């Protein structure tokens, strides 16, 4: 199970709302005071994931807006209003159910003052010359990101999966300090599995596919919203480890007006297709601002769970 949850759940127009609407910081920041996680029940989330036949869960510790669901000493832009460390409760709940612990961590940060603003094609302030990058020091941002990843890898016990997101244009590889970053993650979390998005986005396959791996190639390919027609093999024909991630509707984060849910039967077919081609499937839910998984998503999970109970062994 993939879970996208954060401040963007409050305006309820999807996780990219700051970017798509070019929303200024002063308009977005007040959501932090509203985010109280009132109904957050990670134990229930874990039970639902397990009942649906899932083996691991990946939650957005930090998405592109820069807001942290964990307690960080490097920023006040975190879930302090809820009075809880949401990631701590999440990892404990998964372990109680025997599920593997996954954390999503974005490489982007639209809140940090040293992240490129004007001219970056996806930053909310990309078209605002007054947000010039003249006095921004990207190396300071990289150190900030490194320190936060170190916190996540240090403060929550064993983490099974680190799901970085994502590389684009010239923002990839060593631009992120990728070798140093991945070395630190593997040192602190031996045995962790890491995706390939220090190199690519959901459309790319990375250096493992080219049989010329970089030091930060990751462990699996992560196609987004697609299933490779023939599975994924590298250029020499060797099967690769891969995981396809899918939304239930058209958004990752909660979007109140998005009722375009895929039928459970379609998602089950996608699951079967992924497995038959040697891959995993990571299915997303987007809880609302209070922490409730939408009813339509719950119904889909229950239908998948009933099917898995009968057919998972095959």
Functional labels for PLM-detected ranges:
Residues 2-314:
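Mature catalytic domains of secreted/periplasmic carbohydrate-active enzymes
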């Amino acid at each position: 199970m993939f879970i996208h949850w954060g401040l963007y759940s409050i305006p309820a127009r999807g996780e990219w709302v700051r970017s798509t609407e070019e929303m200024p910081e002063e308009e977005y920041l007040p959501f932090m005071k509203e985010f109280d996680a009132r109904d957050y029940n990670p134990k229930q989330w874990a039970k639902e994931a397990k009942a649906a036949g899932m083996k691991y869960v990946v939650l957005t510790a930090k998405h592109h807006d820069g807001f942290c669901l964990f307690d960080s000493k490097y920023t006040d832009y975190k879930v302090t209003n809820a009075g809880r460390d949401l990631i701590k409760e999440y990892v404990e709940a998964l372990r109680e159910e025997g599920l593997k612990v996954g954390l999503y961590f974005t490489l982007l940060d639209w809140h940090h003052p040293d992240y490129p603003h004007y001219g970056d094609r996806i930053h909310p302030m990309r078209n605002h010359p007054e947000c010039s990058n003249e006095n921004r020091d990207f190396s300071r941002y990289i150190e900030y990101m490194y320190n936060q990843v170190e916190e996540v890898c240090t403060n929550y016990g064993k983490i099974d999966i680190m799901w970085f997101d994502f590389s684009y244009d010239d923002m990839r590889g060593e631009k992120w300090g990728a070798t140093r970053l991945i070395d630190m993650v593997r040192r602190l979390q031996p045995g962790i599995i890491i995706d390939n998005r220090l190199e690519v986005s959901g459309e790319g396959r990375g250096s493992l596919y080219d049989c010329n791996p970089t030091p930060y190639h990751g462990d699996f390919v992560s196609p987004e919203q697609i299933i490779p027609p023939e599975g994924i093999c590298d250029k020499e024909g060797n099967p690769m480890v891969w995981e396809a991630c899918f939304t239930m509707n058209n958004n990752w984060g909660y979007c109140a007006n998005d009722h375009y849910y895929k039928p459970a039967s379609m998602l089950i077919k996608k699951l079967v297709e992924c497995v038959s081609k040697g891959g995993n499937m990571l299915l997303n839910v987007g809880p609302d601002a209070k922490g409730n998984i939408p009813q339509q998503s719950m119904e889909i999970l229950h239908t998948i769970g009933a099917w898995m109970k009968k057919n998972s062994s095959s």
